[in-house]
Amino acid sequence: MGRMCIAMAPRTLLLLIGCQLVFGFNEPINIVSHLNDDWFLFGDSRSDCTYVENNGHPKLDWLDLDPKLCNSGKIAAKSGNSLFRSFHFTDFYNYTGEGDQIIFYEGVSFSPSHGFKCLVEGDNNKWMGNKARFYALLYKKMAQYRSLSFVTVPYAYGGNAKPTSICKDKTLTLNNPTFISKESNYVDYYYVSEANFTLQGCDEFIVPLCVFNGHSRGSSSDPANKYYTDSQSYYNIDTGVLYGFNSTLDVGNTAQNPGLDLTCMYLVLTPGNYKAVSLEYLLTIPSKAICLRKPKRFMPVQVVDSRWNSTRQSDNMTAVACQLPYCFFRNTSADYSGDTHDVHHGDFYFRQLLSGLLYNVSCIAQQGAFLYNNVSSIWPVYGYGHCPTAANIGYMAPVCLYDPLPVILLGVLLGIAVLIIVFLILYFMADSSVRLHEA
């Protein structure tokens, strides 16, 4: 698209005349907002109106969200949780929501400050990579779908071994994917194991496919004390498509050779029948999936930076995941500084940023939200909605550039109108003089 403007309604003619005299009119505002009432927000404690505490603080002082929105029915939020955390771990909140314009303000509840590792000598950096890949896919798909929810994935395993929880740290225990223990009749982990699972009821599903990226030692009962290279895949029984990958790193789970941890890829799968296959080590099966329903016309999601005050370590994985054209990232330039609750809740600038949810705007773009659809000094990049006409800044005042055709037509019509007015004035003046002469 060039920097020419689409013809506007006649009422904007005055704006055309005055735009060179006005500087800074209808600039983009750094807020998250919506074009109409068809929106939804996914959040954590900073937008959780149901959180209850008895510490003498003012009511709802932990919110960055305006309390007027608490009863809007357009928010799914849980203190201490996030979509990533609920997707992978037993600490689960059933995030469910639907809207055309989707906003995310969560993610900080799984950050480097938690330092999660699957194994004692594991690597939290791998989990930060998992987080970035998860949100990148989630944002991309929610620019195309209205509805998000969680579903349980049923599976059938023909062996006698049971699920095992080998990936846990402090208060978090991984349960997606599910790990199946080694069958007792095998001496080591060099065997093929498989299980069937079914995906149904949604347009598409987001599921994890994970491997321990490195050399995994078998159990203490393994007489050979062998190390294994993890290999996992999902096979679509209906279509014949295979998804899979192997571990590639030369790391282990010892103090001398640390770094072994779970690396996850995130897949978008269609409804159908699948087979999970492990060629070595533990079999993994998806136990939960994000259910995507109701396709919509492409509409970028808006993501608000989810971070702690600088006294606690944060990450930038949601910023890494939020990329054009499917995502607009919103942030403030200052350190997060909470108010009466604590330093991590109730930041003044983030409250301003989220105050845009109280009203509709005309246009949402990369630079922010535009209140009006008439004129702006900034061209809306990746604009959605009824976006303003372009106006370039030149010298000391803006110079408005419009599509020349409607401007020429307006000039012709204005010239004709002037000629008609002059003709009528002369006609009535001549008519008046004739009548005076006859009198």
Swiss-Prot record:
Region annotation (Esterase domain 2) ranges: 282-395
Subunit structure and binding partners: Homodimer; disulfide-linked. Forms a complex with the M protein in the pre-Golgi. Associates then with S-M complex to form a ternary complex S-M-HE.
Signal peptide: 1-22
Enzyme Commission number, as recorded: 3.1.1.53
Residues exposed to the Intravirion side: 429-439
Gene name for this UniProt entry: HE
GO cellular-component term (any): viral envelope
Main location (coarse class): virion
Annotated glycosylation sites: 94, 196, 246, 309, 316, 331, 360, 374
Superkingdom, taxonomy of origin: Viruses
Pfam families: Hema_esterase, Hema_HEFG
Annotated function: Structural protein that makes short spikes at the surface of the virus. Contains receptor binding and receptor-destroying activities. Mediates de-O-acetylation of N-acetyl-4-O-acetylneuraminic acid, which is probably the receptor determinant recognized by the virus on the surface of erythrocytes and susceptible cells. This receptor-destroying activity is important for virus release as it probably helps preventing self-aggregation and ensures the efficient spread of the progeny virus from cell to cell.
The protein's name in its UniProt record: Hemagglutinin-esterase
InterPro entries xref list: Capsid_hemagglutn, HEMA, Hemagglutn-estrase_core, Hemagglutn-estrase_hemagglutn
Residues at the active site: 45 (nucleophile), 342 (charge relay system), 345 (charge relay system)
Keyword Ribosomal protein belongs to the record: no
Ranges for region Esterase domain 1: 12-132
Molecular function as annotated in GO: host cell surface receptor binding; sialate 4-O-acetylesterase activity; sialate 9-O-acetylesterase activity
Membrane topology: Single-pass type I membrane protein
PTM characteristics: N-glycosylated in the host RER.
Reactions catalysed, as given in the entry: N-acetyl-9-O-acetylneuraminate + H2O = N-acetylneuraminate + acetate + H(+); N-acetyl-4-O-acetylneuraminate + H2O = N-acetylneuraminate + acetate + H(+)
Spans traversing the lipid bilayer: 408-428
Keywords: Disulfide bond, Glycoprotein, Hemagglutinin, Host cell membrane, Host membrane, Hydrolase, Membrane, Signal, Transmembrane, Transmembrane helix, Viral envelope protein, Virion
Cysteine pairings via disulfide bonds: 49-70, 118-167, 202-291, 210-264, 322-327, 363-387
